[in-house]
């Protein structure tokens, strides 16, 4: 569709712009970025060694493992490519997207022409889920962020990612400093399923 064509044009336009690589969060991005440096995001749903090896063989230079993977299973996921280990990472901070949709859940409140691209959905328990619109899609986020900044070395990975979506520039700077100093998080947060795993 048009969105995919626009994405392909943007990638082609940036190839000589000095970027270190491209983050891919959808399997379709692998085709769009084929032959370019790629790092896999959590949208690829990497939860096991088979998936990790598939993406490594397809050319990912690094990849993010989903927060649904138990800490004891993370080290078994790391793939190899060309006889060398492919770096793996985890989310150390971020509001996880719960749903991505082309239909707008806010359109009953106001039309797109009068929308500031942000909103909130409230569930029956009065929990507020942030909504952000952009690039033709709407993303509904978990209101409680994952935070692992105070647990350095708890997970066997090569790097950590701070995923900023709802935060202001100042809030992001504060969170990065908390991660750098391994400070505890102030407010509600989750550890994902790193220490629980899925059944």
Label each region the model flagged.
Residues 1-54, 58-199:
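Active-site pocket-lining/capping segments in soluble small-molecule metabolic enzymes
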């Amino acid at each position: 569709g048009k969105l995919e064509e626009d994405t392909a044009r943007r990638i082609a336009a940036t190839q000589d712009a000095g970027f270190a690589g491209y983050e891919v969060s959808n399997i379709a991005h692998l085709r769009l970025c084929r032959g370019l440096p790629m790092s896999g995001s959590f949208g690829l749903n990497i939860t096991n060694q088979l998936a990790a090896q598939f993406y490594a063989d397809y050319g990912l230079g690094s990849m993010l493992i989903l927060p649904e993977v138990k800490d004891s299973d993370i080290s078994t996921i790391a793939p190899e490519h060309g006889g060398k280990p492919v770096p793996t990472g985890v989310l150390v901070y971020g509001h996880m997207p719960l749903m991505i949709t082309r239909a707008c859940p806010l359109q009953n409140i106001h039309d797109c022409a009068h929308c500031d691209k942000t909103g909130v959905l409230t569930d029956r328990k009065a929990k507020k889920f942030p909504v952000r619109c952009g690039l033709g899609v709407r993303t509904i986020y978990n209101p409680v962020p994952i935070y692992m900044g105070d647990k350095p070395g708890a997970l066997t990975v090569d790097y950590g990612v701070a995923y900023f979506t709802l935060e202001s520039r100042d809030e992001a700077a504060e969170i990065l400093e908390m991660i750098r100093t391994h400070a505890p998080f102030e407010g509600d947060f989750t550890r994902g399923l790193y220490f629980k795993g899925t059944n």
